[in-house]
Curated annotation (Swiss-Prot):
Name of one Pfam family that matches: RNA_pol_Rpb1_4
Principal localisation: plastid
Localization per Swiss-Prot or TrEMBL: Plastid, Chloroplast
Annotated EC: 2.7.7.6
Cofactor: Zn(2+)
Gene designation per UniProt: rpoC2
Positions of Zn(2+) binding: C220, C291, C298, C301
Keyword Lipoprotein set for record: no
Family statement: Belongs to the RNA polymerase beta' chain family. RpoC2 subfamily.
Gene source species: Ranunculus macranthus (Large buttercup)
A single GO cellular-component term on record: mitochondrion
PANTHER family: DNA-DIRECTED RNA POLYMERASE SUBUNIT BETA
UniProt name for this protein: DNA-directed RNA polymerase subunit beta''
């Protein structure tokens, strides 16, 4: 040893890693014995110092970091903004999760970095600081949890809980934080126990597989090797050195013509350094993979022993060492897990900040727009980008590395220290990336819409899985789906309006509907047209048969009309819609009275048409049957003018006016079945109640069955009643189909009591000779005075000169003897009381045949009234119908001109005329104040509106502020038809006031802007086809509702721009659409009115390309249904507790990623591809070789990755020995001609090759990957197998097969108490082995062929190496060229 004076003196703190280096160098220089002596001295020194220091730890030593408060606040602020963006639909769930993780992770990391300087400055001798930062006890992560913040936790699956724990353990946790903390830490505590046993079991299995592998020869004579090349940057230098040191070269290595190293030379540090400096050609090394021996290994293929730096000794049990070296770190590391307590760890990106204030410039051609991982718009640069920032007095140049995100636009002004770019963190080999599926579930019930085209996923062409081609929103439009089990089909046609109480809504949704609606949300009348407009790309489809949607949050599907105290049912049939009225009080008193007002779609009433009708519940039946008027003749053809037209599609049928006191109804049960259905009862048989008729239909009454076939259907009727077999003299026998009214029977007969209701006699002849009489019960309906409908329309006291009259008429809806069919669960209305409209003809003879009716809504401050308005007026607008017009009649000015002619009262003279001419009627529909329901009649002469004067002053000021450009013009009288003031673009919005007193208000104040704007009368007309006549004076367009632009008039002042709103448009949260400020909820515009919108609330979900959408467009989703599935990459938690299962999965050859294919499947694919390329016999042999080599390298890399991520160094050799055992078997396939092995038998690869050589014919086999468990059960020794698992089965099989155990392994010998063939016990075997010569046989046909294939078809060979192996980027042996395949 050198003198002390010559030694270098280091004055440094030595930590763990420095200590490791020191020891390794000491061993290199001085050898083992001397090193141990030095280490003893170090140990003694350490213990002395620790004793004198005597560190103790108290709670006061935990000092919280001062900057923590504002850091946490800042992070909370960012999370809040993020949450908002998510609600607005700007970021999707995965982006939100990622970003919240990164926000909190960055905060936590920053606190962690602050910790050390903080301790150093405030209290350097703090025991916590000394202990943790010296590496003696505890680490930074634990101290950080004590004094910083606990941060994000991962749940037991290694997923992230996105609620961070902001407190540290010194401050104490809140209840929620404590629970989350336990949830995460449970993994630490419980799993440490569980995983320790796991790790032990893993070690046991590993040792089991390789226990028989012992070094038994010096050289096996193989010429194969695996080439490792340092040239490509995939392998880091450190890994490269680790791979090479201790190996043996498989081939001579030349540098130019000079040989640097020869075959079979072992590689030391010096040689490796020369390789790195020279960067010569790929280096071929021997590995356990290439060793030719079947069940052992040779010294040269193994290399140097890990214990001393020389070649491994003969007789060394390298298998057991390998198993232990892989299993042991697992046990160690599981014990080490609890220190983090489940705290999540991940990586963040670096940022580039602006050096100074100024304008930023870069070349826009070199970047292209993209979206960052957090959903922000950014530019991605492919190459180095030079960015200049023009400061106030200096130009700054910043270089941005390739693949970075630029977060600002070109020419944007940036502030100093603003983040301008984000450098992508290099995908380090330490964290795993795995592709995960994340399902997004719906928060609410509703109907699904998406705003872009979607593709069907190819494998689900007929399913409901769609792929998104571009980023777009999915919308869930709110609505309560109705789950109806009873109705097999819906009564409601597409686009019908449905009442909440409608018949098919069997469950009562009424209870949980809060029909709270504010006034501006009252839904306007909008009846969509029948045909969908295909051209514009809108298809309004009906979402299934029995789904009825209704919802209480004022979001009515298909804009059903609702108000606070009435449910209006608007059913739109082909040519009319009806609105039944009902008020709250009425609801409580009696079942729903169906007073309905009918208005034809074109809004035109003829004389004597029905205005309203009432369906009396007393005349309602639940069963099918026949109406009879009895013996009384019915005048079905009444006087011409009394005949009421009732049009239906094409069929014209009169309603039978009722002039009789009573009529009869004969009930019967009818089932109409498809022709193919099997009926379980016979014709003319008699059945009881609840008899099964078909598979799923049961009868509701008992009686006689009649079955008739009609076209393709079967009509099955069940008649209830009594059966008589009359004698021949009995008079009843001659009659069939006679109705006997009550009291007509003989007084003395027994039946007289039964005849109270009357009977119906029907003769039935089942066969020619037999007949009997069926006596059926009859229900009698007496004529009742229907509710006096006219009373519901009280005459207004001011309306003495009203010219509209109403009559009440009762109608029977079905003819004499007409069968009535009941369509699933509806009621049949037999009698309808109708209100017929009539009006006086004008005295001058200008007869008005049609009256136009429409709805008007009038506001009185906060009160809203709806009216039916009838105008006895011929408007200056005619209805035209174009042939190809899909929507129907539209409003078009008579002469097509846009402006002046539409104004009928341009001069004062015309105003007077129009007042006389335009008399009309308005009747209210709803009355909120009175208990009785009244419809007030108003005529145009006494209905006018007043503007609120108090707001005028305010607007006056407004105008003064705007430079007095518009001084208020003089007020002038204006009255339009029906007293409606034309609303010209004015400075304020109207409030409507209704007055019944003509004298009170004669003048209407209105800003006279007629001369300045185009003088067009501003009608607001929606005709019931959904056509709109646009009330904006400057634009006269006819818009159909599907692309319905509405110009929102901002009444405050004219300079303000107006938003364009389309019907059906979707709004995200917080979009400004009105002057009152941003709209707070997201939704879809349902109805647009002059001064209000109705928005159906909806929730947007953002989805990016490649996401999978579940469900169809317009499908009804329930809460918690899966909406979208995102596939995204996430870095796996670097905790070994998650790592160990990964190791185990690889070794057991189970699938690893949740998405990537199984390793086994991959091997199959390989086999097929190569066989296809090379033809059968060669294909099998080479295929098996290549497949096995390929999968071996992949497996080694996968396992190394887990351990390296934990900073554990395991030499590749150990893993290779294990992997060699997993992959050393092949499966004999049926294609072989030889009878040596049976198909499906597992044999060793080398054995298969040798047998093939001996037989001189090819054995066909393919590679399989066995897991370690299967490999342990497929060894050559049945004793070893039996001692591992399934003892009885293994021994029984071995006995039946007559297997022989050659006792080559360790375990068999231990079990039988023999000498184990390793170490000294091995020496006895050596003399037996020395006779075996290593001479190489002469090359036979196969080898020559093999060499030819591999060397003369280089490109073919390359094409076989797959490009799609998952880990190729980080593969250690990136070139897997086998230098030679010949032996």
């Amino acid at each position: 040893m050198a003198e002390r004076a010559d030694l270098v003196f280091h004055n440094k703190a030595i930590d763990g890693t420095a200590m490791k280096r020191l020891i390794s160098r000491l061993i290199d220089h001085f050898g083992m014995a001397y090193t141990s002596h030095i280490l003893d001295q170090v140990k003694t020194l350490g213990f002395q110092q620790a004793t004198t220091t005597s560190i103790s730890l108290g709670i006061d030593d935990l000092l919280t970091i001062p900057s923590k408060g504002w850091l946490v606040q800042d992070a909370e602020q960012q999370s809040l903004i993020l949450e908002k963006h998510h609600n607005y639909g700007n970021v999707h769930a995965v982006e939100k999760l990622r970003q919240s993780i990164e926000i909190w992770y960055a905060t936590s990391e920053y606190l962690r970095q602050e910790m050390n300087p903080n301790f150093r400055m405030t209290d350097p001798s703090n025991p916590v600081h000394i202990m943790s930062f010296s590496g003696a006890r505890g680490n930074a992560s634990q101290v950080h949890q004590l004094v910083g913040m606990r941060g994000l936790m991962s749940d037991p699956q290694g997923q992230m809980i996105d609620l961070p724990i902001q407190s540290n353990l010194r401050e104490g946790l809140s209840l929620t934080e404590y629970i989350i903390s336990c949830y995460g830490a449970r993994k630490g505590v419980v799993d440490t126990a569980v995983r320790t046993s796991d790790a032990g079991y893993l070690t046991r299995r590993l040792v089991e597989v390789v226990q028989h592998i012992v070094v038994r020869r010096t050289d096996c004579g193989t010429t194969r090797g695996i080439s490792v090349s340092p040239r490509n940057g995939m392998i880091t230098e450190r890994i490269f050195i680790q791979t090479l040191i201790g190996r043996v070269l498989a081939d001579d290595l030349y540098m130019g013509s000079r040989c640097i190293a020869i075959r079979n030379q072992d590689i030391g540090v010096g040689l490796v350094n020369r390789f790195i400096t020279f960067r010569s050609q790929p280096i071929s090394i021997r590995t356990p993979f290439t060793c030719r021996s079947t069940s052992w290994i040779c010294r040269l293929c193994y290399g140097r022993s890990p214990t001393h730096g020389d070649l491994v000794e003969l007789g060394e049990a390298v298998g057991i060492i390998a198993g232990q070296s892989i299993g042991e770190p697992g046990t160690q590391l599981t014990l080490r897990t609890f220190h983090t307590g489940g705290v999540f760890t991940g990586g963040t990106a670096e940022h580039v900040r602006a050096p100074d204030n100024g304008k930023i410039k870069f070349n826009e051609g070199l970047v292209y727009p993209t979206r960052t991982r957090h959903g922000y718009p950014a530019f991605l640069c492919y190459i180095d980008l030079s960015v200049t920032i023009e400061g106030p007095d200096i130009l700054h140049n910043v270089n941005i590395p390739p693949k970075s995100f630029i977060l600002v636009k070109n020419d944007q002004y940036v502030e100093s220290e603003q983040v301008i770019a984000e450098i992508r963190a290099e995908a380090s080999t330490l964290n795993f990336k795995e592709r995960v599926r994340k399902h997004i579930y719906s928060d609410s019930e509703g109907e699904m819409h998406w705003s872009t085209a979607v593709y069907h996923a190819p494998e689900y062409t007929y399913g409901n899985v769609h792929l998104l081609p571009k980023t777009s929103h999915l919308w869930i439009l709110s609505g309560v789906p109705q789950r109806s089990s009873i109705v097999p089909f819906s009564l409601h046609k597409d686009q019908d309006q449905i009442n909440i109480h409608s018949l098919s809504a069997k469950q009562k949704f009424i209870s949980n509907l809060s029909l709270s609606m504010t006034n501006d949300q009252v839904i306007k009348k909008l009846f969509r047209s029948d045909s969908s407009v295909k051209k514009g790309g809108w298809v309004l489809d009906y979402s299934g048969p029995a789904e009825v949607l209704c919802n209480g949050h004022c979001n009515l599907i298909y804009s059903a009309i609702l108000d606070e105290n009435s449910d209006l049912l608007a059913k739109r049939r082909r040519n009319r819609f009806t609105i039944p009225l009902q008020s709250n009080q009425e609801k409580e008193q009696k079942p729903r009275s169906g007073i309905s007002i009918e208005i034809p779609i074109n809004g035109l009433f003829r004389i004597n048409s029905i205005l309203a009708y009432f369906e009396d519940p007393r005349y309602r039946r639940k069963s099918s049957g026949i109406t009879k008027y009895g013996t009384i003749e019915v005048d079905s053809i009444v006087k011409k003018e009394d005949l009421i037209e009732y049009r239906r599609t094409k069929e014209f049928r009169p309603k039978y006016q009722m002039k009789i006191d009573r009529f009869f109804f004969i009930p019967e049960e009818v089932h109409i079945l498809p022709g193919s259905s099997s009926i379980m009862i016979r014709n003319n048989s008699i059945i009881g109640v609840d008899t099964r008729i078909t598979f799923n239909i049961r009868s509701q009454v008992g009686g006689l069955v009649r079955v008739e076939k009609k076209k393709k259907k079967i009509e099955l009727k069940i008649f209830s009643g009594n059966i008589y077999f009359p004698g021949e003299t009995d008079p009843i026998s001659w009659h069939s189909g006679i109705l006997i009214p009550p009291g007509a029977g003989k007084k003395n007969s027994k039946e007289s009591k039964k005849l109270k209701n009357g009977i119906y006699v029907q003769r039935i002849t089942p066969t020619k000779k037999k007949y009997f009489v069926l006596v059926r019960p009859v229900v009698t309906y007496e004529r009742a005075d229907g509710i006096n409908l006219a009373a519901l329309f009280p005459q207004d006291p001011l309306q003495e000169r009203d010219n509209v009259q109403l009559r009440v008429v009762n109608y029977i809806l079905y003819g004499n003897g007409k069968p009535i069919r009941r369509i699933s669960h509806t009621n049949i209305q037999l009698v309808r009381t109708c209100l017929v409209l009539n009006w006086d003809q004008d005295k001058k003879g200008s007869s008005i045949e049609e009256v136009r009716a429409s709805f008007v809504e009038i506001k009185i401050n906060a009160l809203i009234r709806d009216f039916i308005k009838m105008d006895l007026v011929k408007y200056p607008i005619s209805y035209t119908r174009k042939r190809n017009d899909p929507v129907g009649s539209g409003l078009i000015p008579v002469n097509g001109s846009d402006h002046t002619n539409l104004n009928p009262f341009y001069s004062k003279a015309s105003i007077k005329q129009s007042l006389i001419r335009h008399q009309g009627t308005i009747r209210t529909l709803l009355n909120k104040n009175k208990e009785c329901q009244s419809l007030i009649t108003l005529s145009s002469s006494n209905c006018s509106r007043i503007d609120p004067f108090n707001r005028l002053k305010y607007h006056n000021n407004m105008i003064k502020k705007s430079n007095k450009r518009d001084i208020l013009p003089p007020i002038r009288n204006l009255l339009g038809p029906l007293g409606i003031i034309p609303k010209i673009t004015n400075f304020f919005s109207f409030y409507y006031l209704i007055t019944h007193n003509q004298i009170l208000v004669k003048k209407n104040s209105q800003l006279d802007n007629l001369k300045r704007t185009s003088p067009v009368l501003k009608y607001y007309l929606i005709d019931e086809n959904g056509r709109i006549f646009n009330p904006d004076p400057s634009i006269n367009m006819i818009l159909n509702p599907f692309n319905w632009n509405w110009y929102f008039i901002h009444h405050d002042y004219c300079e303000e721009t107006s938003t364009i709103i389309n019907l059906g448009q979707f709004f995200c949260e917080n979009v400004c659409i009105s002057k009152s400020g941003p709209h707070l909820k997201s939704g879809q515009v349902l109805i647009v009115d002059v001064d209000s919108l109705v928005i159906r609330s909806a929730k947007p979900y953002l989805a990016t390309p490649g996401a999978t959408v579940h469900g169809h467009y317009g499908e009804i989703l329930y809460e918690g249904d899966t909406l979208v599935t995102f596939i995204y990459e996430k870095s796996r938690s670097g905790d070994i507790t998650q790592g160990l299962p990964k190791v185990e999965q690889v070794l057991e050859v189970r699938s690893i990623d949740s998405i990537s294919m199984n390793l086994e499947n991959r091997v199959e694919g390989w086999n097929e591809r190569i066989t296809r390329t090379l033809g059968i016999p060669w294909g099998f042999l080479i295929g098996a070789e290549l497949t096995i080599a390929q999968s071996r390298i992949s497996l080694v890399n996968k396992i190394q990755k887990v351990y390296r991520s934990q900073g554990v160094q395991i030499h590749n050799r150990h893993i290779e020995i294990i992997v060699r055992q997993i992959t050393s078997k092949v499966l004999v396939s049926e294609d072989g001609m030889s009878n040596v092995f049976s198909p499906g038998e597992l044999i060793g690869l080398l054995r298969a090759e040798r047998t093939g050589r001996a037989l001189e014919e090819a054995i066909c086999y393919r590679a399989v990957l066995l897991g370690i468990t299967r490999a342990s059960l497929n060894t050559q020794s049945f004793i070893s197998e039996a001692s591992f698992q399934e003892t009885a089965r293994v021994l029984a099989k071995a006995a039946l097969r007559g297997r022989i155990d050659w006792l080559k392994g360790l375990k068999e010998n231990v079990v039988l108490g023999g000498m184990i063939p390793v170490g000294t016990g091995f020496k006895g075997l050596v003399h037996r082995l020395s006779n075996i010569s290593l001479e190489i046989e002469k090359k036979n046909l196969f080898k020559g062929g093999m060499r030819d294939i591999l060397f003369h078809h280089k490109e073919l060979f390359d094409s076989c190496i797959p490009r799609n192996f998952p880990d190729t980027s980080e593969q250690l042996f990136t070139k897997q060229s086998f230098t030679r395949f010949t032996d």
